[in-house]
Amino acid sequence: MTIEIHDLSKQFGSFTALNDINLKVNPGELLALLGPSGSGKTTLLRVIAGLETADSGQVLFNEEDSTDKHIRDRHVGFVFQHYALFRNMTIFENVAFGLRVRPRKQRPNAPEINHRVTELLQLVQLDWLADRYPHQLSGGQRQRIALARALAVEPSVLLLDEPFGALDAKVRKELRAWLRKLHDDMHITSVFVTHDQEEALEVADRIVVMNRGRIEQIGTPDEVYEKPANPFVYEFLGHVNLFHGRVHQGHAWIGDLEVDAPEYSEAEDLSAIAYVRPHDIEVDRTLNGEPALAAHIVHILAIGPVVRLELAGKDNQSTNSIYAEISKERFRELQLARGDQVFIKPRKLDLFPNHAQNGSIH
């Protein structure tokens, strides 16, 4: 199933929830709608489902205009954050519910329903819980049952609204891997909403980054992480260091550090913002004859095989603390301690003169 969104807009009073959205979801794709609260991601999902009506624009399923179709005619499965399981029904009956309430002509017979439900419970690896009730299950188990119930009616499209948002971190991580594998096995066109950057990067085939009712960027996890389209995407996708500087005729200056910026060869003394991820910062005790920024260590935090350094710059090139991530081996080699002076330089940075177009400097 292909989903196409054309020129979609939606207002709630004076608030613009969606502003001229254009998007195509490919058959069998697992697409993430990622953004902060109020970005429009859930509204877009609900419009696709038929739970909300757009003020303008079109929703097409397999090139057929479905904008005005009722939700029951769109053949979508919907999974909510809070499960929405029927408390008075067993797990088996919860999964069977959508099949039992179908119109008589479309309703499978009892043996077919039993076979389908058993098959789905085996798929989500919870067939041994068929006779239990929702309150007897963990949060992760309940969410898997909610997904099985959505799949029972054999939807053409699966829509998930922050499906793991109510679960703890360990369970979320386990279910992310499980959902990715399940999708690879089933190849059903799926769209899920999340505000969790790691979740989107780990699970999705492509990510749609949204902000204030607009799409900021569409791309694979690698594309949006390695080549952010603008400062918003850069700051939203994981930890990042922000430096203030200037760019002039193909060169950029951040404090005393000069780097080549050939894509801005025609720039004339523009203010600029440079972004560097913590793992792209080299740390050394000496200058080694190369330009670098001086800083001192404020805090040291070891996280597994990685050591995270909080640094304070000697100049005003960064308005906040600077963070660098190095391996434990490198940390031991440098014999670093709190208060030590170090010299830092970026392996890679992305420069945005006047918050304009993206350029990568290596």
Curated annotation (Swiss-Prot):
CDD domains: ABC_CysA_sulfate_importer. It comes from the Bacteria. Its EC number is 7.3.2.3. Keywords: ATP-binding, Cell inner membrane, Cell membrane, Membrane, Nucleotide-binding, Sulfate transport, Translocase, Transport. The keyword ATP-binding applies. Transmembrane segments: none annotated. Residues 3-237 form the ABC transporter domain. GO terms for molecular function: ABC-type sulfate transporter activity; ABC-type thiosulfate transporter activity; ATP binding; ATP hydrolysis activity. ATP binds at G35, P36, S37, G38, S39, G40, K41, T42. It is a peripheral membrane protein. Part of the ABC transporter complex CysAWTP involved in sulfate/thiosulfate import. Responsible for energy coupling to the transport system. NCBIfam families: 3a0106s01. The complex is composed of two ATP-binding proteins (CysA), two transmembrane proteins (CysT and CysW) and a solute-binding protein (CysP). Belongs to the ABC transporter superfamily. Sulfate/tungstate importer (TC 3.A.1.6) family. This is Sulfate/thiosulfate import ATP-binding protein CysA. It comes from Nitrosomonas europaea (strain ATCC 19718 / CIP 103999 / KCTC 2705 / NBRC 14298).
